[in-house]
Amino acid sequence: MSIGYLKSILENGRNIVCLLGRGPAAEQGCDLYREDFSYDVEVRYGRSPSEIVNSTFYNNRPEVFYEFYREDILNRRGEPDEVNFCLKRLEDDGKLRGIVTRGFFDLSRRAGCHNVIHLYGNIDRNFCPHCGRIYDAEYILSHKPLPLCEKCGTLIHPGIALSGEMLDRRTMNRAIELISSADILLVVGTDLQSRLGSMAKYFTGDRICLINTTDHYSDEAADCV
């Protein structure tokens, strides 16, 4: 795919939706699945990242969970990169209607994008399960060892979805509705067989444009790669 061809497609789009994978965030160091990171976590905590980011572990060992959440997620949140700012420019031009992502580092919103649907939550919307009050990442970082709600004293729930918890059905429905209304689907940093990329099945528009650093057999389903 030539840059010029992609540019012409995006310029003609009026209702672009982006499926934003973890590729760009991983390049910023925001990746819980790197082998070296997983090894380091297991050495320090005696558990893998996937075992810690689990509802049972959170409920049984909240102090350890929040140590990991602060040191290994919030302190590794990175900064928006050129991908995020390109999406912001598309939004400013009135072409990009929204972003759907499984990432929870909130990079696109921090770049200035407004309609970002986080399927697995995000680190700046930690919440009190009792009264619903919202707390950002800075609050969690500054309240050790356990962040409690200022209003009712309840332990704050992390803003990210934990393994063993149900995803929010309303959020999923919003994402499906957004994708199904798009005329161009821009898939970035993932392939069409991933959990996020497979949501392209709800797309009924004109073009699927795929931007990824690695090839995948599912690429042939895209109109431009």
Language model segments and positions:
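Conserved catalytic core of sirtuin-type NAD+-dependent deacylases
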Residues: 1-225
